[in-house]
Amino acid sequence: MSTSTEHRWLAFDTSTDVLSLAVARGGQVWTQTLPGGAQASSGLIPAVLAMLSDADMPLASLDAIVFGRGPGSFTGLRTACAVAQGLAFGADVPVLPVDTLLAVAEEARWTQVQAGAIAPDAALTVLALLDARMDEVYSAAYRWEPVPGASHGRWHEALPLQVGAPEKLHMPNDLVVLQAGNAFSAYGDRLPHVAPGGLRCEALPTAAALLRLASALWAQGLAVPAEQAMPLYIRDKVANTTAEREAMKAQAVEAKTALAKAAAQP
Protein backbone atom coordinates (compact mmCIF):
# COMPACT_ATOMS: atom_id res chain seq x y z
CA MET A 1 0.00 0.00 0.00
CA SER A 2 1.17 3.50 -0.66
CA THR A 3 0.08 6.78 0.82
CA SER A 4 -2.45 8.48 -1.43
CA THR A 5 -1.15 11.71 -2.97
CA GLU A 6 -4.69 13.10 -2.81
CA HIS A 7 -5.01 12.97 0.98
CA ARG A 8 -3.57 14.90 3.87
CA TRP A 9 -3.00 12.84 7.00
CA LEU A 10 -1.60 13.30 10.47
CA ALA A 11 -0.67 9.98 12.09
CA PHE A 12 0.71 9.04 15.50
CA ASP A 13 1.13 6.01 17.73
CA THR A 14 1.86 5.99 21.47
CA SER A 15 1.02 2.35 22.23
CA THR A 16 4.63 1.32 22.96
CA ASP A 17 7.69 2.93 24.56
CA VAL A 18 8.25 4.83 21.30
CA LEU A 19 6.28 7.89 20.19
CA SER A 20 5.97 7.83 16.40
CA LEU A 21 4.54 10.69 14.32
CA ALA A 22 4.10 11.34 10.61
CA VAL A 23 2.42 13.81 8.29
CA ALA A 24 1.59 13.23 4.63
CA ARG A 25 0.81 15.87 2.03
CA GLY A 26 0.88 15.61 -1.74
CA GLY A 27 3.04 12.50 -1.75
CA GLN A 28 5.52 14.00 0.74
CA VAL A 29 5.92 12.39 4.15
CA TRP A 30 7.47 13.84 7.30
CA THR A 31 8.29 11.41 10.13
CA GLN A 32 9.62 11.75 13.66
CA THR A 33 10.42 9.33 16.47
CA LEU A 34 10.54 10.45 20.11
CA PRO A 35 10.62 8.79 23.53
CA GLY A 36 7.21 7.40 24.42
CA GLY A 37 5.91 5.92 27.63
CA ALA A 38 5.28 8.51 30.33
CA GLN A 39 6.81 11.25 28.15
CA ALA A 40 4.23 10.81 25.40
CA SER A 41 1.47 12.57 27.33
CA SER A 42 3.47 15.80 27.54
CA GLY A 43 5.40 15.55 24.29
CA LEU A 44 2.78 14.51 21.75
CA ILE A 45 0.85 17.77 21.29
CA PRO A 46 3.94 20.04 20.91
CA ALA A 47 5.49 17.53 18.50
CA VAL A 48 2.31 17.36 16.40
CA LEU A 49 1.98 21.14 16.16
CA ALA A 50 5.67 21.54 15.28
CA MET A 51 5.49 18.89 12.56
CA LEU A 52 2.38 20.43 11.02
CA SER A 53 4.13 23.80 11.04
CA ASP A 54 7.21 22.34 9.34
CA ALA A 55 4.97 20.82 6.67
CA ASP A 56 3.10 24.14 6.30
CA MET A 57 -0.12 22.24 6.80
CA PRO A 58 -2.94 23.67 8.96
CA LEU A 59 -4.68 21.08 11.10
CA ALA A 60 -8.04 22.01 9.58
CA SER A 61 -6.73 21.05 6.13
CA LEU A 62 -6.35 17.39 7.14
CA ASP A 63 -8.61 14.72 5.73
CA ALA A 64 -8.31 12.79 9.00
CA ILE A 65 -6.18 12.17 12.07
CA VAL A 66 -4.89 8.60 11.97
CA PHE A 67 -3.92 6.99 15.29
CA GLY A 68 -3.01 3.63 16.75
CA ARG A 69 -5.97 2.61 18.90
CA GLY A 70 -4.43 -0.47 20.49
CA PRO A 71 -3.80 -2.89 21.91
CA GLY A 72 -0.83 -1.58 23.85
CA SER A 73 0.08 0.46 26.90
CA PHE A 74 -3.12 1.60 28.62
CA THR A 75 -1.61 5.01 29.37
CA GLY A 76 -0.30 5.37 25.83
CA LEU A 77 -3.64 4.45 24.29
CA ARG A 78 -5.50 6.94 26.46
CA THR A 79 -3.04 9.63 25.41
CA ALA A 80 -3.44 8.86 21.71
CA CYS A 81 -7.23 8.79 21.89
CA ALA A 82 -7.50 11.96 23.95
CA VAL A 83 -5.15 13.93 21.72
CA ALA A 84 -6.85 12.62 18.57
CA GLN A 85 -10.23 13.64 20.02
CA GLY A 86 -9.09 17.09 21.08
CA LEU A 87 -7.34 17.96 17.83
CA ALA A 88 -10.14 16.52 15.70
CA PHE A 89 -12.81 18.42 17.63
CA GLY A 90 -10.83 21.64 17.38
CA ALA A 91 -10.19 21.31 13.65
CA ASP A 92 -13.53 19.68 12.77
CA VAL A 93 -11.94 16.67 11.05
CA PRO A 94 -12.64 12.94 11.52
CA VAL A 95 -10.36 10.36 13.07
CA LEU A 96 -9.19 7.09 11.57
CA PRO A 97 -8.45 4.44 14.25
CA VAL A 98 -6.02 1.66 13.26
CA ASP A 99 -5.23 -1.56 15.12
CA THR A 100 -1.63 -1.43 16.30
CA LEU A 101 -0.97 -5.08 15.42
CA LEU A 102 -2.03 -4.42 11.82
CA ALA A 103 0.44 -1.53 11.78
CA VAL A 104 3.14 -3.92 13.06
CA ALA A 105 2.35 -6.32 10.22
CA GLU A 106 2.50 -3.54 7.63
CA GLU A 107 5.75 -2.12 9.02
CA ALA A 108 7.36 -5.57 8.98
CA ARG A 109 6.24 -6.36 5.44
CA TRP A 110 7.40 -2.96 4.18
CA THR A 111 10.78 -3.25 5.91
CA GLN A 112 11.43 -6.71 4.51
CA VAL A 113 10.39 -5.65 1.00
CA GLN A 114 12.76 -2.68 1.18
CA ALA A 115 15.55 -5.00 2.34
CA GLY A 116 14.92 -7.38 -0.57
CA ALA A 117 13.99 -10.28 1.71
CA ILE A 118 10.41 -10.44 0.38
CA ALA A 119 9.18 -9.73 -3.13
CA PRO A 120 6.88 -6.67 -3.34
CA ASP A 121 4.09 -8.73 -4.91
CA ALA A 122 4.48 -11.80 -2.69
CA ALA A 123 1.45 -12.92 -0.71
CA LEU A 124 2.31 -13.63 2.90
CA THR A 125 0.88 -14.16 6.36
CA VAL A 126 2.32 -12.13 9.24
CA LEU A 127 1.98 -13.04 12.91
CA ALA A 128 2.20 -9.72 14.78
CA LEU A 129 3.39 -9.93 18.39
CA LEU A 130 3.65 -7.13 20.95
CA ASP A 131 4.84 -7.46 24.53
CA ALA A 132 1.76 -7.05 26.74
CA ARG A 133 3.77 -7.18 29.99
CA MET A 134 2.54 -9.36 32.86
CA ASP A 135 4.13 -12.35 31.08
CA GLU A 136 1.70 -12.10 28.17
CA VAL A 137 1.75 -11.22 24.48
CA TYR A 138 -0.72 -9.41 22.24
CA SER A 139 -1.03 -11.21 18.92
CA ALA A 140 -2.97 -11.28 15.67
CA ALA A 141 -2.28 -12.69 12.22
CA TYR A 142 -2.87 -10.92 8.94
CA ARG A 143 -2.73 -12.07 5.33
CA TRP A 144 -1.40 -9.69 2.67
CA GLU A 145 -2.37 -10.40 -0.92
CA PRO A 146 -1.51 -8.42 -4.07
CA VAL A 147 -4.29 -6.87 -6.12
CA PRO A 148 -4.14 -8.16 -9.72
CA GLY A 149 -3.12 -5.42 -12.11
CA ALA A 150 -2.33 -2.95 -9.32
CA SER A 151 0.83 -1.87 -7.53
CA HIS A 152 -0.68 -2.36 -4.07
CA GLY A 153 -2.24 -5.12 -2.02
CA ARG A 154 -4.82 -5.74 0.68
CA TRP A 155 -4.62 -6.95 4.25
CA HIS A 156 -7.09 -9.51 5.60
CA GLU A 157 -7.40 -10.74 9.17
CA ALA A 158 -6.21 -14.35 9.43
CA LEU A 159 -6.50 -14.66 13.22
CA PRO A 160 -8.29 -12.22 15.58
CA LEU A 161 -6.60 -10.20 18.28
CA GLN A 162 -5.77 -12.19 21.39
CA VAL A 163 -3.70 -11.87 24.53
CA GLY A 164 -2.14 -14.67 26.53
CA ALA A 165 0.95 -16.57 27.57
CA PRO A 166 3.44 -16.88 24.67
CA GLU A 167 3.30 -20.67 24.58
CA LYS A 168 -0.50 -20.72 24.47
CA LEU A 169 -1.05 -18.49 21.45
CA HIS A 170 -3.37 -19.81 18.76
CA MET A 171 -1.79 -20.05 15.33
CA PRO A 172 -3.50 -19.27 12.00
CA ASN A 173 -4.18 -22.03 9.51
CA ASP A 174 -2.11 -20.19 6.89
CA LEU A 175 1.63 -20.76 6.83
CA VAL A 176 3.20 -17.86 8.72
CA VAL A 177 5.99 -16.43 6.60
CA LEU A 178 6.88 -13.60 8.94
CA GLN A 179 6.75 -13.10 12.71
CA ALA A 180 7.04 -9.45 13.66
CA GLY A 181 6.91 -7.27 16.74
CA ASN A 182 8.83 -6.47 19.92
CA ALA A 183 8.20 -9.65 21.94
CA PHE A 184 11.18 -11.75 20.84
CA SER A 185 13.81 -10.55 23.31
CA ALA A 186 11.43 -10.94 26.26
CA TYR A 187 9.90 -14.32 25.40
CA GLY A 188 12.28 -16.00 22.93
CA ASP A 189 11.68 -19.74 22.60
CA ARG A 190 8.34 -19.51 24.39
CA LEU A 191 6.88 -17.98 21.22
CA PRO A 192 5.62 -20.12 18.31
CA HIS A 193 8.43 -21.58 16.21
CA VAL A 194 9.20 -19.92 12.91
CA ALA A 195 8.03 -21.96 9.92
CA PRO A 196 10.71 -23.37 7.59
CA GLY A 197 11.84 -20.55 5.34
CA GLY A 198 10.10 -18.00 7.54
CA LEU A 199 11.53 -14.88 9.12
CA ARG A 200 11.44 -13.01 12.41
CA CYS A 201 11.92 -9.28 12.53
CA GLU A 202 11.64 -6.52 15.09
CA ALA A 203 8.85 -4.09 14.19
CA LEU A 204 6.77 -1.45 15.93
CA PRO A 205 3.47 0.19 14.95
CA THR A 206 5.04 3.24 13.31
CA ALA A 207 3.17 6.31 12.13
CA ALA A 208 4.59 5.69 8.65
CA ALA A 209 2.86 2.29 8.65
CA LEU A 210 -0.38 3.98 9.73
CA LEU A 211 -0.08 6.30 6.74
CA ARG A 212 0.42 3.40 4.34
CA LEU A 213 -2.73 1.77 5.72
CA ALA A 214 -4.81 4.95 5.82
CA SER A 215 -6.01 5.17 2.22
CA ALA A 216 -7.49 1.66 2.17
CA LEU A 217 -9.17 2.13 5.57
CA TRP A 218 -10.53 5.49 4.46
CA ALA A 219 -11.93 3.91 1.29
CA GLN A 220 -13.69 1.32 3.47
CA GLY A 221 -15.49 4.11 5.31
CA LEU A 222 -13.73 3.50 8.63
CA ALA A 223 -13.16 7.17 9.50
CA VAL A 224 -15.35 8.19 12.45
CA PRO A 225 -16.28 11.39 14.33
CA ALA A 226 -13.87 12.66 16.96
CA GLU A 227 -15.93 11.40 19.90
CA GLN A 228 -15.48 7.82 18.66
CA ALA A 229 -11.70 7.91 19.12
CA MET A 230 -11.61 5.19 21.75
CA PRO A 231 -8.86 2.78 22.87
CA LEU A 232 -8.97 -0.91 22.01
CA TYR A 233 -8.36 -3.06 25.09
CA ILE A 234 -8.32 -6.83 24.70
CA ARG A 235 -7.55 -7.74 28.29
CA ASP A 236 -10.34 -8.08 30.85
CA LYS A 237 -9.85 -4.36 31.49
CA VAL A 238 -12.17 -3.33 28.67
CA ALA A 239 -13.99 -0.41 30.26
CA ASN A 240 -12.48 2.90 31.24
CA THR A 241 -12.80 3.74 34.91
CA THR A 242 -14.28 7.07 35.90
CA ALA A 243 -10.78 8.38 36.63
CA GLU A 244 -9.54 7.25 33.22
CA ARG A 245 -12.46 8.90 31.44
CA GLU A 246 -11.75 12.13 33.29
CA ALA A 247 -8.07 11.87 32.37
CA MET A 248 -8.96 11.43 28.70
CA LYS A 249 -11.30 14.42 28.84
CA ALA A 250 -8.57 16.53 30.42
CA GLN A 251 -6.07 15.55 27.73
CA ALA A 252 -8.62 16.25 25.00
CA VAL A 253 -9.24 19.71 26.45
CA GLU A 254 -5.48 20.28 26.60
CA ALA A 255 -5.19 19.37 22.92
CA LYS A 256 -8.00 21.75 21.94
CA THR A 257 -6.47 24.52 24.06
CA ALA A 258 -3.04 24.02 22.49
CA LEU A 259 -4.60 24.15 19.04
CA ALA A 260 -6.44 27.37 19.87
CA LYS A 261 -3.24 28.99 21.19
CA ALA A 262 -1.32 27.94 18.08
CA ALA A 263 -4.03 29.38 15.84
CA ALA A 264 -3.97 32.68 17.74
CA GLN A 265 -0.24 33.18 17.24
CA PRO A 266 0.69 35.63 14.45
Where in the sequence are the language-model features?
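Short, glycine/acidic-enriched loop or turn micro-motifs at the edges of active sites
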Residues: 16, 134, 239
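DPxDG-like acidic metal-binding loop motif
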Residues: 66-94, 100
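Acyltransferase
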Residues: 198-266
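Stable alpha-helical structural segments in soluble proteins, enriched in small hydrophobic residues
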Residues: 51-55, 90, 108-111, 210-218, ...
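Surface "functional belts" at beta-alpha junctions
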Residues: 3, 39, 94-206, 259-265
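Residues at secondary-structure transition points
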Residues: 35-43, 74, 78, 82, ...
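N-terminal beta-alpha supersecondary unit
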Residues: 2-71, 266
